[in-house]
């Protein structure tokens, strides 16, 4: 049986939380801020939790995290 490996692209983008969820950075944060309000920019700053419907898929990509 081949070695299990983490998907490196996913490992760079997602962090596992203590309760088994996943956090990731927000999209729409690299440029074109003139079209966004101050509130939108502030809310995009931190990390956000991934949707529960996708957690099963991420667990397969990152078996060791």
Curated annotation (Swiss-Prot):
GO terms for biological process: translation. Residues 1-52 are annotated as: Disordered. GO terms for molecular function: structural constituent of ribosome. GO terms for cellular component: cytosolic large ribosomal subunit. SUPFAM superfamilies: L35p-like. Residues 31-44 have a biased composition (Basic residues). Keywords: Ribonucleoprotein, Ribosomal protein. It comes from the Bacteria. Belongs to the bacterial ribosomal protein bL35 family. PANTHER family: 54S RIBOSOMAL PROTEIN BL35M, LARGE RIBOSOMAL SUBUNIT PROTEIN BL35M. This is Large ribosomal subunit protein bL35.
């Amino acid at each position: 049986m081949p070695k299990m490996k983490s998907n490196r692209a996913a490992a760079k983008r997602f962090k596992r939380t203590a309760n088994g969820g996943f956090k990731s950075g927000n999209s729409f944060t690299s440029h074109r801020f003139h079209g966004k309000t101050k509130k939108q920019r502030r809310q995009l700053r931190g990390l956000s939790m991934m949707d529960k419907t996708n957690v099963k898929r991420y667990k397969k990509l990152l078996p060791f995290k």
